[in-house]
């Protein structure tokens, strides 16, 4: 909905209330302060009507306020403001802490604009709250401040329109729905004066310019513009909270290219902020667009840090590549890649450049990946995560096989057995805490006439029977294909500790292939690692389904329980036709 329509939508109600007889009383101002009755609170008081009104209203309801005042030294009169606030607090019997900071000098030294430098105020408030023992910090932001903030967010083109939050940390802003006129009326009724800050009328400051030049024009056409803009902030904050919750549910194995752009932007913002990185709204949109489209993008952030999006991943720092954890043979050499490097893998010899590209490594990082080569210069080991070995290299050093690599080999052998019986080619094994196989399984759905006979369930049953317990929290489930919801549910019920899978499951995957069920809060959460020997697992699937298609083309027929149909899931379709997953 456009800002224009939101303004129009709020005009009727607001104008009716403003045109009605004015029965505004102190009750409207004091009611939001009732949660603070009898509590120690710190109030930021500048001397203006809003903050003075908040102080007087807190005293009226029985709160226990202390005052903090920042003399920002931006005007010669700021010294008089500080003295005025101190005198007011003395007359009211309220503790007062005054701090003087040359905000202009700080802004120049740190290359801030003056509006940004005013954030120093919250540092002052936090220190004063600690000194006074206050539980919360209260500021007197009003509906006018909220409306101005929404306008600034809109004009800056920010991706999120949230306005001023009612609460952030220990800071509370109880008067965001209160108008300035109500506060002035309240103070006049008390016979209380206040100070006027001339900088609030200085058009060099964006907020002051909006207040003096823009809002009067808006109010001429839309008398309830202030209320409407405050409502935009409230609705925007609700929407933002919902989208933030969706972003927080993304797990390391969730495919980012399937997320809505609004969710991606919030996920990216959280990731960048967690690394202490600043960014612009345009950069955030650019990175989110690249993630959504599966593209590669390299950007330099305002702090000078380079970030990269590639292969559906965000890289904010140089990668920490693993070092060899075994003795190096004397004729092996440690180096980085060179033109023409190749490595012999299970599927044949490949260019190292293609291997690193398929691993979606940032281009700038590919020249940093450590390699080990033999006396002939052939690549034997690649220091990616997990490390990649050439065929026979590990064995030539007398090193034990990588447990997960070996376990996936057993699962692939079971998947091959399933394929030979015209089953969906999926195999699974369960490893105990020592890495020993304690359960094996393959798909037998057609063999047994039961579509719940999946490889994972068979392996879990065998492991539970052998170990004498249904709970397998110290065990690892290794399966050639990303589990479906049924099998993931069984693994959760078994309290499996780790899940390792090979190929992604774009038709029925429950770990990101279709939906990431672990994004929800279950009573148990295993760790997940995908992509182990994924190429071999995917190749087996392609071979099986390629044969199915060729056979179907040679002998047209309606798929039935004995003849697998191409491109199916490991369940029965709505039409009753058995399906298989590719």
From Swiss-Prot:
Residues 563-575 have a biased composition (Low complexity). InterPro entries: CMP_dCMP_dom (IPR002125), Cytidine_deaminase-like (IPR016193), Lysidine-tRNA-synth_C (IPR012796), Rossmann-like_a/b/a_fold (IPR014729), TilS/TtcA_N (IPR011063), tRNA_aden_deaminase (IPR028883), tRNA_Ile_lys_synt (IPR012094), tRNA_Ile_lys_synt_N (IPR012795). Keywords: ATP-binding, Cytoplasm, Ligase, Nucleotide-binding, tRNA processing. ATP binds at residues 46-51. Its EC number is 6.3.4.19. The keyword Chaperone does not apply. The keyword Glycosyltransferase does not apply. It comes from the Bacteria. It is an enzyme of class 6 (ligase). One of its GO terms (molecular function) is tRNA(Ile)-lysidine synthase activity. Residues 548-582 are annotated as: Disordered. Residues 402-525 form the CMP/dCMP-type deaminase domain. GO terms for biological process: tRNA wobble adenosine to inosine editing. It catalyses: cytidine(34) in tRNA(Ile2) + L-lysine + ATP = lysidine(34) in tRNA(Ile2) + AMP + diphosphate + H(+). GO terms for cellular component: cytoplasm. Gene3D superfamilies: Cytidine Deaminase, domain 2, HUPs. It is found in: Cytoplasm. Ligates lysine onto the cytidine present at position 34 of the AUA codon-specific tRNA(Ile) that contains the anticodon CAU, in an ATP-dependent manner. Cytidine is converted to lysidine, thus changing the amino acid specificity of the tRNA from methionine to isoleucine. HAMAP family: tRNA_aden_deaminase, tRNA_Ile_lys_synt. Belongs to the tRNA(Ile)-lysidine synthase family. The N-terminal region contains the highly conserved SGGXDS motif, predicted to be a P-loop motif involved in ATP binding. This is tRNA(Ile)-lysidine synthase. It comes from Deinococcus radiodurans (strain ATCC 13939 / DSM 20539 / JCM 16871 / CCUG 27074 / LMG 4051 / NBRC 15346 / NCIMB 9279 / VKM B-1422 / R1). The gene is tilS.
């Amino acid at each position: 909905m456009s800002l224009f329509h939101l303004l129009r939508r709020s005009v009727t109600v607001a104008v009716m209330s403003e045109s009605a007889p004015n029965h505004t009383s102190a009750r409207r101002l004091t009611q939001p302060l009732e949660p603070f009755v009898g509590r120690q609170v710190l109030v930021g008081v500048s001397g203006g009507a809003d903050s003075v009104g908040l102080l007087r209203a807190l005293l009226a309801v029985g709160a226990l306020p202390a005052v903090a005042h920042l003399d920002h030294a931006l005007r010669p009169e700021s010294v008089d403001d500080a003295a005025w606030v101190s005198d007011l607090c003395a007359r009211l019997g309220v503790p007062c802490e005054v701090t003087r900071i040359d905000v202009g000098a700080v802004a120049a030294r740190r290359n801030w604009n003056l509006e940004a430098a005013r954030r120093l105020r919250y540092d002052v408030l936090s220190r004063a709250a600690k000194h006074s023992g206050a539980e919360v910090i209260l500021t007197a932001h009003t509906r006018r401040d909220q409306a101005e903030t929404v306008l600034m967010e809109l004009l800056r083109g920010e991706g999120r329109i949230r306005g001023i939050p009612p609460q952030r940390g220990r800071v509370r802003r109880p008067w965001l729905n209160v108008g300035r006129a109500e506060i002035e009326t309240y103070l006049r009724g008390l016979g209380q004066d206040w100070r006027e800050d001339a900088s609030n009328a200085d058009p060099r400051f964006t907020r002051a310019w909006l207040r003096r030049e823009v809002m009067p024009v808006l109010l001429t056409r839309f008398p309830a513009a202030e209320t409407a803009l405050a409502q935009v902030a409230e609705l925007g904050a609700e929407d933002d909270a919902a989208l933030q919750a969706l972003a927080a549910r993304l797990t390391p194995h969730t495919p980012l290219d399937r997320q809505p752009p609004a969710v991606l932007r919030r996920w990216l913002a959280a990731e960048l902020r967690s690394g202490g990185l600043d960014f612009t709204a345009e950069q955030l949109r650019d990175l989110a667009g690249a993630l959504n489209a599966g593209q590669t993008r390299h950007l330099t952030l305002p702090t000078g840090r380079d970030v990269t999006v590639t292969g559906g991943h965000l890289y904010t720092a140089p990668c920490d590549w693993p070092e060899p954890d075994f003795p190096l043979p004397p004729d092996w050499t440690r180096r980085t890649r060179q033109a023409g490097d190749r490595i012999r893998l299970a599927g044949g010899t490949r260019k190292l450049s293609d291997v690193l590209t398929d691993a979606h490594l940032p281009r700038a990082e590919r020249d940093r990946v450590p390699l080990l080569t033999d006396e002939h210069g052939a690549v034997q080991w690649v220091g990616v995560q997990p490390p990649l070995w050439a065929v026979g290299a590990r064995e030539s050093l007398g090193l034990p096989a990588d447990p997960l690599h070996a376990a996936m080999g057993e699962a692939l052998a079971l998947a091959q057995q399933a394929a030979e019986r015209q089953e969906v080619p999926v195999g699974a094994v369960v490893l105990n805490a020592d890495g020993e196989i304690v359960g094996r399984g393959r798909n037998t759905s057609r063999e047994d006439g039961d579509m719940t006979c999946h490889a994972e369930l068979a392996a879990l049953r065998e492991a539970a029977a052998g170990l004498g317990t249904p709970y397998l929290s110290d065990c690892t489930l290794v399966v050639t294909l990303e589990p479906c919801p049924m099998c993931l549910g069984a693994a959760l019920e078994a309290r499996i500790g780790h899940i390792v899978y090979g190929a992604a499951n774009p038709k029925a995957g429950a770990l990101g292939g279709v939906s990431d069920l672990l994004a929800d809060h279950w009573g148990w959460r295993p760790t997940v690692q995908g992509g182990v020997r994924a190429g071999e697992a995917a190749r087996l699937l392609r071979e099986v389904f390629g044969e199915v298609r060729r056979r179907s083309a040679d002998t047209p027929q309606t798929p039935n329980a004995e003849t697998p149909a191409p491109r199916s899931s490991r369940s029965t379709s709505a039409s009753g036709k058995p399906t298989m997953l590719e």
